[in-house]
Structure formats: structure tokens, C-alpha cells
């Protein structure tokens, strides 16, 4: 990236994994600095995806990274699966929630037939909050059958929440169409 040449007045610290220093050790040292931005060149392996999520959660004001997912849902799925494969999480929904919390925007670039890169779309990630909408009316029910009906209502809500794994929604806020950028969801 040659950031020292582009930003000569900035205090830039570069780290790279070696045979004797792991990427996790680099991240642990970086967390102790007062850095503002983390740039992770290529999130192509499961451990690097895990480091990126960690860095975005606690190590800086924001984190930039590259990835080759074709769609936003593919990006979330790939990062979630990396978190599961590295053993950071064992629950699919929890892993996805953590990924979604750090993905604010996806700036998706493509290359045209001439080899020129351009931004195809900018997508915003909106985490969905889990609503606690259980019905506590069973306490007021007079009969056993009425209490049982309320119990089954709450059980239905619980199992719907457990099986509906939607943790986010996403919207394209800018798209490239016919040579122009168009605001689609300002």
C-alpha cells in the first residue's frame, strides 16, 4: 500500500506474520497501541478473518479489509464460517451476530472488460435487534387450559426466534448504473 509515502506525516506501524511471530501476536501488540485505523490487506484465510473481527471489535476506531465475496450475504457467511472453523465460536447465530456488528459498510469493487476498477455498490449492514416480546399474560390466566394456551404461545415465539437466524438486513445505498452513481437508499 506504500502508506508511508502517501502519508509521510502519519505514524504508521506495519506488522507481518513471520515464522517466529504469529499474526495473533501481532494483533495482541497492536491492541496495546493507540492506533486509530487497522488495515488488513487480504482476509482470505480463517485465522485472518478471526483477527479482522477482533481488530474491528477492540483494537481501533475502524478497520478496513479486502475480501473477494461476490455479494454482501456471501461476505457475512464467509466470515461467519471462518469464525466457526477457527473455533472462536461454536454457535452459528452468535458468530454471525459478531460479524454483523463489525460490518458497517461494504464497498464492492469490480473490474470492467478494460481492466479498470470501479465501485459497483456501497452496501450498508443493519444489525437486527432481538425483541423480547414474550407474553406474560399466563400469570393472569384463571384456568389450567388458559395457562397452557399462553405457554404454547410463548413456546411458539421462542422456537420461531431460535430457528429464524436472520441477524441483519442490508441495503445498497449507492449503485453504479450506466456510467453514473445513483443513490438508491439515501
Listing of model-derived features with the role each one plays in the protein:
Residues 1-100:
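Switch/coupling sub-region of P-loop NTPases
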Residues 2-5, 92-96, 105-110, 151-163, ...:
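Intrinsically disordered, low-complexity boundary segments flanking structured domains
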Residues 3-19, 114-131:
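C-terminal lobe/lid and adjacent interdomain/linker elements of RecA-like ASCE P-loop ATPase modules
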Residues 9, 21, 49, 105, ...:
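A generic structural micro-environment signature
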Residues 13-15, 55, 79, 111, ...:
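Generic alpha-helix signal with a bias toward terminal, lower-confidence helices
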Residues 51-54, 83, 96-121, 125-127:
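Helical/strand "switch-coupling" subdomains that flank nucleotide/phosphate-binding cores, especially
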Residues 118-186:
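NTP-binding/hydrolysis catalytic cores, primarily Walker-type P-loop NTPases
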Amino acid at each position: 500500500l506504500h502508506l508511508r509515502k502517501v502519508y509521510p506525516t502519519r505514524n504508521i506501524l506495519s506488522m507481518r506474520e513471520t515464522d517466529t511471530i504469529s499474526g495473533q501476536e501481532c494483533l495482541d501488540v497492536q491492541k496495546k497501541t493507540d492506533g486509530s485505523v487497522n488495515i488488513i490487506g487480504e482476509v482470505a484465510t480463517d485465522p485472518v478473518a478471526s483477527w479482522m473481527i477482533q481488530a474491528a471489535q477492540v483494537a481501533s476506531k475502524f478497520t478496513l479489509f479486502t475480501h473477494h465475496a461476490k455479494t454482501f450475504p456471501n461476505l457475512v457467511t464467509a466470515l461467519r464460517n471462518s469464525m466457526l472453523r477457527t473455533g472462536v465460536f461454536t454457535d452459528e447465530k452468535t458468530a454471525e451476530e459478531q460479524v454483523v456488528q463489525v460490518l458497517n459498510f461494504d464497498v464492492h469493487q469490480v473490474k470492467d472488460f478494460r481492466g479498470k476498477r470501479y465501485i459497483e455498490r456501497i452496501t450498508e449492514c443493519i444489525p437486527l435487534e432481538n425483541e423480547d416480546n414474550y407474553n406474560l399474560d399466563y400469570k393472569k390466566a384463571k384456568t389450567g387450559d388458559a395457562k397452557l394456551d399462553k405457554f404454547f404461545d410463548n413456546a411458539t415465539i421462542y422456537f420461531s426466534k431460535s430457528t429464524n437466524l436472520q441477524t441483519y438486513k442490508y441495503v445498497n445505498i449507492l449503485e453504479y448504473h450506466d456510467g453514473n452513481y445513483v443513490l438508491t437508499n439515501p
